[in-house]
């Protein structure tokens, strides 16, 4: 993927903007009780490598379950932009919702289906 503008995404209203360090090779579509409601398509990056503008001033968070990560959404339009660990560790990951990026970026990514509702394994 050489088209640099494809690495820039935002929520619907533009208050939260994300820039990826590189195009992802893979993304995950999870069917857990939260991800299936969010319609998230998650690409993973080392925490701190994705530039996120408008966070935290324009975002709200949702923390649930084992309380190890926060799901982040725009306070204005409600789009979920990413999730991040509550206690980041060196080399730790966070997930970016590719649905906030140009659809051509998604077309270039292998999507893996993850059974977060039951077996916690990939099902593809």
Label the predicted regions:
Residues 1-10, 15-124:
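A short Gly-Trp-Pro
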